[in-house]
Amino acid sequence: MDLNNSNNQNSNPDKEFIQAAYTTVMFLIDHFNCVKDELKIDYESFIILQVVNSHWLYYKKKDEKITWGETWKKIGANDAEKTLQKKKLSILAISHILKLPQETCRRKIQSLLKKKILRKTTESGIVMGENFVDFHQKYSAKFAHSVSKFILSLSELDKKFFENLLKIKI
């Protein structure tokens, strides 16, 4: 597939690369700044939180379907501790998943533990802490809004451009 040539210049989604690229890059910059401004943590710590969150979500979705509101209630009620028994998430596992040095990962997790955003238990490993919901819920709503806005801002040609990208063999 040639992303540079097309017979019909007016409807060529590949000609929309510049707009699709700009929209995507601005979304990423906005996301980075939102993490920094809203959560006041570094991006690696944010991604560590996402690993902990995804670990719980992965096992939770196997058991039940829950709404946005139910998710926060379950997190607030320490559901992760019950759900993740015998499915522990460790510092070593997070370090391996993110390809971060183990000591860096340990220090960042220690900081999140101190703020009670995360909690470490012998039965369930690293899970969401008592301050996780207050810390993360407002940001998550803004992020969901931002993702929705990003997706809806894409024109049909932008979407075609991304569809074409998926056809390229990497």
Regions found by a protein language model. Give the residues of each.
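Short, cationic-aromatic polyanion-contact patches
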Residues: 73-76, 90, 117, 122-146
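N-terminal leader segment of winged-helix/HTH proteins
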Residues: 1-50
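Short amphipathic alpha-helical interaction segments
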Residues: 99-114
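Intrinsically disordered, acidic Ser/Thr/Pro-rich low-complexity regulatory segments
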Residues: 36-38, 44-49, 62, 66-70, ...
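Amphipathic alpha-helical interface surfaces
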Residues: 44, 87-90, 105-108
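Short helix->loop/beta-hairpin flanking segments within DNA-binding domains
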Residues: 47-87
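Short, amphipathic alpha-helical interaction segments positioned at domain boundaries
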Residues: 134-167
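A short alpha-helical element within helix-turn-helix/winged-helix DNA-binding domains
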Residues: 81, 86-96, 112
